[in-house]
Regions:
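Short beta-strand and strand-turn-strand segments in soluble, beta-rich domains
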Residues: 113-123, 247-258
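Enriched for extracellular/lumenal, surface-exposed ectodomains of secreted and cell-surface proteins
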Residues: 160-162, 186, 244, 261, ...
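Intrinsically disordered, low-complexity Pro/Gly/Ser/Thr-rich segments with frequent PxxP/GP/PP motifs
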Residues: 250-280
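Asparagine-centered strand-capping/turn motif at beta-strand->loop junctions
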Residues: 228-232
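Secretory targeting signatures
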Residues: 1-46, 87, 156, 203, ...
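Short proline/glycine- and polar residue-rich coil/turn motifs
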Residues: 122-135, 260-268
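Beta-sheet-rich sandwich/jelly-roll-like modules and their strand-loop junctions
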Residues: 31-112, 146-153, 159-210
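Terminal connector regions
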Residues: 275-312
């Protein structure tokens, strides 16, 4: 803790005087929990982390350093999975805290948010004074999943409202244990940042590897079938399909949707649309997506003759 605090105190003095900007068929369907509070059809995996506690810093506006400052903190990291699902920080809050803690994901420290989420004070343990490690908790920041590029640097920016005595505690380490990133601090609401190469926050990121699907449409009598096959190396989670028939004169069967919780590598789904009845030239469209698969689609021109569908 002494290492972390001494490092930051020196940095706060520097920050006060400088303004440097750091510019099927699949039979293994199941439901599972992604974390303690949010139900999800898939289990994400730990990607990046630093969990070696050394001390805590106030996050927000307080006079912990002998003068009032609104401290915002950013942790850089380099993901190894293509999908980023959530992150955690080891944190607590002061008894007077009344505004949410906000986390934003960025690929540029002062750029646009790729994802953002607020967590209310009631989700944090309350402490009086500087917390011990046992008084802290891993807080989930469960934003909407985003695609990232493995090997590229991203930033987890954590802040709260600039209101006196509205502050949280966030844990870290002053010995640069995490090799793929570092801590940045701001005392002007994120306008300018100073980097501390010998410090890291206590954090975890979670994600999934991208996988790939192959799709095909097979028209026939009374109904149309389609095949979704996992041709990638990882399980596809929360697979959803949307089949539509557009054009022509369709009495029954314009839209069919479906979902399964997982499709393992090499596995395939053989699904049918149900009864299609109509006449005329139509377009058959199939869109498929999954939690860790970018949306793909296929279209086929066809003729519907009552209950028979033929691709043309």
């Amino acid at each position: 803790m002494k290492k972390l605090l001494s490092c930051i105190i020196i940095g706060m003095v520097v920050l006060g005087g400088l303004g440097a900007v750091v510019t099927a068929t699949n039979r293994n369907q199941k439901n599972s929990q992604r974390n303690d509070t949010t139900s999800s059809p898939y289990v994400d995996e730990l990607d990046q982390s630093m969990t070696d506690y050394d001390g805590s810093l106030p996050l927000g506006r307080t006079n912990i350093f002998g003068f009032y400052a609104n401290l915002s903190i950013a942790q850089s990291f380099i993901p190894q999975k293509e999908l980023l699902t959530r992150t955690q920080f080891l944190m607590a809050r002061n008894a007077s805290t009344s505004y949410p803690c906000v986390l934003a994901v960025r690929d540029n420290l002062t750029g646009e948010n790729l994802a953002i989420i607020s967590v209310g004070p009631n989700e944090f343990p309350v402490v009086n004074g500087t917390p011990t490690e046992d008084q802290l908790a891993w807080i989930n920041f469960n934003f909407n999943d985003i695609w990232v590029i493995p090997g590229q640097t991203y930033y987890l920016v954590v802040y709260t409202a600039n209101i006196t005595e509205n502050y949280y505690w966030i844990a870290g380490n002053g010995t640069n244990i995490y090799p793929n990133g570092t801590v940045m601090l701001s005392i002007d609401d994120g306008k300018t940042w100073s980097e501390f190469t010998n410090a890291d926050g206590c954090f975890k990121t979670y994600g999934l590897h991208e996988t790939f699907l192959e799709i095909a449409i097979k028209p026939g009598l009374f109904k149309t079938t389609f095949v979704i096959k996992n041709i990638g190396n990882y399980t596809a989670w929360d697979v959803t399909w949307n089949f539509t028939v557009s054009g022509g004169f369709i009495l029954l069967g314009r839209n069919f949707i479906g979902n399964i919780s997982e499709l393992t590598p090499g596995g395939e789904i053989i699904a049918s649309t149900g009864f299609i009845l109509g006449l005329g030239k139509v377009t058959l469209s199939l869109k498929v997506s999954a939690a860790n698969v970018k949306e793909l689609s296929i279209q086929k021109d066809a003729i519907v003759l009552l209950f028979f569908v033929k691709i043309i």
